[in-house]
UniProtKB/Swiss-Prot annotation:
One of its GO terms (cellular component) is endoplasmic reticulum. It catalyses: a very-long-chain acyl-CoA + malonyl-CoA + H(+) = a very-long-chain 3-oxoacyl-CoA + CO2 + CoA. The keyword Ligase does not apply. It is a multi-pass membrane protein. Its main location: endoplasmic reticulum. Belongs to the thiolase-like superfamily. Chalcone/stilbene synthases family. It is found in: Endoplasmic reticulum membrane. It comes from Arabidopsis thaliana. Expressed in leaves and seedlings. This is 3-ketoacyl-CoA synthase 8. The active site is at 213, 292, 376, 380, 409, 413. The gene is KCS8. Induction: Repressed by herbicides such as flufenacet and benfuresate. Down-regulated by darkness, low temperature, drought and osmotic stress.
Length: 481
């Protein structure tokens, strides 16, 4: 029976194939051409519509996609050697100023000098940081003229080197963003730069003031937004802080801390949205994350410029500062994490979150391993305690925070520009390789915590006149606390 079925299907198959062969033998080339033409004519409108949609979607994508932002180069200001001071020299200046009656005028105020000396000894600052000329002469010069002189030397020094290294002409700059927190004269620092370098009349310039040590990342984010709107142009970001005008000569201890930490420094950064600059750029900007917790009174008031009881202006740092900084940092990390962490870390974080919320409230929060997302960390060199805390909470190794510690040791707290000195350190050490990811993170008054993420487009070598050129062979150093 089975054999009969097989024979039947074979006969049926052969018959069908024979029929098709006979039919096909009657179809010639002309018939095939007519068939093709008929179907093409019938579907011409459909084909045209599909082609139009493809072209339209492609054009729409090209017009609306975020434009890449490249970091062509950056320059950190290296002050002249005559501005270099050791801790002993600095405290000698303080005692001399007190004896001359310029500050802390009574003998009972000796403890204020001792208080600052103790902070300096434990600060992580080295013996070669810089203070401006106005604070090294007697009587002290803290007026507008001395303050302008310091700022001009820093900004013009960084910009001159940047233009020299990149070959970009000032007339090519279409966007300028300057940030300086406490020194904001009229005309603005941005206008001062426009005047000095004769920048073009239609330049888009902004001057950010009062935004603290995290303003460098804010300035980059603002420039990034402008580069999305204005095509085929360069943007310059300048980050600095003025020390001359901000030396506090009163007796409020919470205001004396800034005297011990802040030093002369500044940086200029050249950004571009021109596709042809990719070949020579060092980095591409991947993400910026900005967190501002100023709606909370404790956050808003933890670092405030104000007058003391004697009418002397200074910056007050409250006891809430560490708690506020930790909270703001936590929000920034929670926002940045999903953008940069690998899937495995995201899942671990999510599972822990669900367990803690619904099953075990006592369970500790999961800290993602950001070492899987970044090769290099540029943590704002605001102070030894800040670096220690981030190293501990993010479970980083001493190598990961080396750039921050060495920047604090060599240059002190240079405010918003410190993250650029740290990036320059990493380059000078020859550690920056193609594809490496960098996390710049800065905290500042307001209270704010801001992050920028970069990726290296090539093996990056230090630029000419790097601030580390004259001392790289001596770093890293052991820091005794």
């Amino acid at each position: 029976m089975k054999n009969l079925k097989m024979v039947f299907f074979k006969i049926l198959f052969i018959s069908l194939m024979a029929g098709l062969a006979m039919k096909g033998s009657k179809i010639n080339v002309e018939d095939l051409q007519k068939f093709s033409l008929h179907h093409t004519q019938n579907n011409l409108q459909t084909i045209s519509l599909l082609l139009f949609l493809v072209v339209f979607v492609w054009i729409l994508y090209m017009l609306t996609r975020p434009k890449p932002v490249y970091l062509v180069d950056f320059s950190c200001y290296l002050p002249p050697s005559h501005l270099k001071v050791s801790i002993q020299t600095l405290m000698g200046h303080a005692r001399r100023a007190r004896e001359a009656g310029m500050c802390w005028k009574n003998k009972e105020s000796d403890h204020l000098v001792d208080f600052q000396e103790k902070i300096l000894e434990r600060s992580g600052l080295g013996q070669e940081t810089y203070i401006p000329e106005g604070l090294q002469c007697f009587p002290l010069q803290q007026g507008m003229g001395a303050s302008r002189k310091e700022t001009e030397e820093v900004i013009f020094g960084a910009l001159d080197n940047l233009f020299r290294n990149t070959g970009v002409k000032p007339d090519d700059i279409g966007i300028l963003v300057v940030n300086s927190s406490t020194f904001n004269p009229t005309p603005s620092l941005a206008s001062m730069i426009v005047n000095k370098y004769k920048l073009r009349d239609n330049i888009k310039s902004l001057n950010l003031g009062g935004m603290g040590c995290s303003a460098g990342v804010i300035a980059v984010d603002v420039a990034k937004g402008l580069l999305q709107v204005h095509r085929n142009t360069y943007a310059i970001v300048v980050s600095t802080e003025n020390i001359t005008q901000n030396l506090y000569l009163g007796k409020n201890k919470s205001m004396l801390v800034t005297n011990c930490l802040f030093r002369v420094g500044g940086a200029a950064v050249l950004l571009s949205n021109r596709s042809r600059d990719r070949n020579r750029a060092k980095y591409e900007l991947v993400h910026t994350v900005r967190i501002h917790t100023g709606s909370d009174d404790r956050s808003f008031e933890c670092a405030t410029q104000e007058e003391d009881e004697d009418g002397i202006i200074g910056v007050t740092l409250t006891k809430n500062l560490p708690m506020v900084a930790a909270r703001t940092l936590k929000i920034n990390i929670a926002t940045l994490g999903p953008l940069v962490l690998p899937l495995k870390e995201k899942l671990a974080f999510f599972i822990t979150f669900v367990k803690k919320k619904y099953f075990k409230p006592e369970l500790r929060n999961y800290t993602p391993d950001f070492k899987l997302a970044f090769e290099h960390f540029c943590i704002h060199a605001g102070g030894r305690a800040l670096i220690d805390e981030l190293e501990k909470n993010l479970k980083l190794s001493p190598l990961h925070v080396e750039a921050s510690r060495m920047t604090l040791h060599r240059f002190g707290n240079t405010s918003s520009s410190s993250i650029w000195y740290e990036l320059a350190y990493t380059e000078a050490k020859g550690r920056m390789k193609e594809g490496d990811r960098i996390w710049q993170i800065a905290l500042g008054s307001g209270f704010k915590c801001n992050s920028s993420v970069w990726v290296a487009l090539r093996d990056v070598k230090p630029s000419a006149n790097s601030p580390w050129e004259d001392c790289m062979d001596r770093y890293p150093v052991e820091i005794d606390i």
